[in-house]
């Protein structure tokens, strides 16, 4: 729609049929070329009802609205023409002024409604006085000659571009792309802009064509000098001081601006300056840092995320469920003391501890004098080096390899640093003495992990010197947590904090008080020894406190009233456990049992305690990569440098009724429980990613995730289940307790260095003789073995004979005899002698047979490939892009693959038989005289070409 067009005539009655019977308000507004607000106002004026843009109106109301809006438009157009009619008849001074004055629209009221599809008809309107332009006649007169030529060649509806004034473009261009003459470069910038507008006011509706690509219907299209100046003032921006020389004229308001005009200045960002100074980009390419310690900030973020997740996380188990599951599980601890029989330290003793729940091993620990754990030991170390960029310090603890102390593990209150100025280089200096505790054993090339936040573990609680808060395990019921809080208010000293363990459930106040007093006395002894060593300045690290053996630690942390019994095999282990339990928990002595391995009547030794409880068998299966589920599914556990990945497969489990969703969900539920058991048994720590089989229903996915979370409630170490990723992967983190099962009983392979592969200098050809790749698995295993055995039997039954001439070869003689018998039967009808057929058979070149066999083989492969492609397409359509075919491994279900294997094997035999017919020296295989190879019916495509049978009539 073009401004200046007069209102069209009222619609004819025939136009009423163009509107539908019923339409919405916004559709009617779009049809009439106006806004929904004006249509709603017209409807309210007609019947007084309040409607919205989505209300429905019938054809009668739509016609009334159209007539009403057309009447208002016609009245507004007549009034506008009558007011300015005397001024429009004035004679302009020149043709240029005529074109300029007739097309200027300054503050002239435009009709709000214009019917669609009406041809634009310009009407004469006067030129309103422009208050913003002071020297309009001067520059119009100066440029009349130059613009006259441009107006003669310019079309009436030429679209003008805003290339010079658009965002992101320079303002120093003075080209003639908009019809401006070259000699305008000497004029002020304001005069250039306004002269261009005066020369092209006939197409002012296209000033903002780059902003509105859809058309010119809903835009204000006046094109006057005042409107153009306002738009230019809004878009005017001042560049930086290092801009072009042409921007000097833009410092401050332009001459055509009214008084008190504000020029907005866009201050570039620091990132933009850095990016533009190098490569002109708008994004920052510099690495940014944070104020303070990065590790402390990461620690704060983890705490915030943990608190937020704790608020959103629903309770995993209620108190009743917690107590019921705790009492329902039968827990037994078995300890075995053995002598090492393999190098490098044969003859040394080691101890194994296994925790069984309902007869299934869920946790395993191993300890020896040579591989004692350092976790919990307290040392007076000496700072060797401080790395501010890594926010870490290396501390000598007297164990050969330096330990690493990160900034997040520094006790800042003890160091006298608080607030934001927490930098490790301010707290520690090389040569300083520092009391540290080992929080993680050295692994591989990494040293021990250290912390200055010392904690002493007791039987019922953990004593934290210098802390001011108390914590209670979330695994305890709410009522028990409240009881323990009241006890701690009276027991815990003001200069220390405690963390209540799950073993303190139901414990009396006197026992907790005694545990706190014992741990506090131990800490005072450690402080006194550290102070004495500092005064001596011996210059060497000193061990202030060492944790007891792993056997004692496991008994202290795990063995409580929940266990049915503790079975011990070995005199040394029995003496250690019996002495500790009598001193710490005399009420649990009745649950101790010593296993005696008496010899049998025939002199054979009794089975081992681990053999009796089938622990060795379960440990051997736990060291395998693949784990079988009770229903037949499998888990594949792979350990990488960054994380542990677990893949869930259905394996042999095909379901017992129901549909695929039920089968997959049942398999995933079993996998969730077994995954938690494997994590505890193998002591897997770090990031764990689980790939469950895809489920369609959201309720089933929530059920599997809930089962996984409930199973993890039995794990005593710290863990956290994160959200499910967009790919359907479940990710969680778990803290390792000690040495893992596989790490304790394995070493890296000397051949492949633990990679599991052997590298060769040349590429390895993994293709079989048939030209197809060998596919490992159970689908083709049976059939492939059968085919190979039959092929080997065929080869064993043939004899090696010298090469014959083509005509004397026994194969051709047998073929000739067969053809002669066929010809003999056909002589009665056709009368052809059999000798001719024999001659034709004898004269046939051997290459024809070779080609025939090759053609049969190629035809077989093509047919099988077509069938396989069809099956694959059908599977893709049925699964709807769900990746279930990799997870669902159904054995012996693809008969087409077996048939293709049979055809390929037959084709191989045919090729081998025909290989020696080309006259090459050597030996060929011929059937033996005394034994015949077993035959098998062959498929049609392998025996003869496709088509109807050929009759020799």
Swiss-Prot record:
- Assembly description: Assembles into a homotetramer formed by a dimer of dimers. Interacts with DNA-binding protein HU (hupB).
Q: Which intervals of the chain are annotated as region Disordered?
A: 1-23, 118-314, 766-808, 822-953
Q: Which UniProt keywords apply?
A: Cytoplasm, Hydrolase, Magnesium, Metal-binding, mRNA processing, RNA-binding, rRNA processing, rRNA-binding, tRNA processing, Zinc
- Name the NCBIfam families for this protein: RNaseEG
Compositional bias annotation for Basic and acidic residues: 14-23, 263-272, 294-311
**Origin species:** Mycobacterium tuberculosis (strain ATCC 25618 / H37Rv)
Q: What is this protein called?
A: Ribonuclease E
Give the matching Pfam families. RNase_E_G
Specify the taxonomic lineage. Bacteria, Bacillati, Actinomycetota, Actinomycetes, Mycobacteriales
* Single GO BP term: mRNA processing
Q: Ranges of Basic residues compositional bias?
A: 157-169, 230-240
What PANTHER family does the annotation carry? RIBONUCLEASE (PTHR30001), RIBONUCLEASE G (PTHR30001:SF0)
Q: What class of enzyme is it?
A: hydrolase
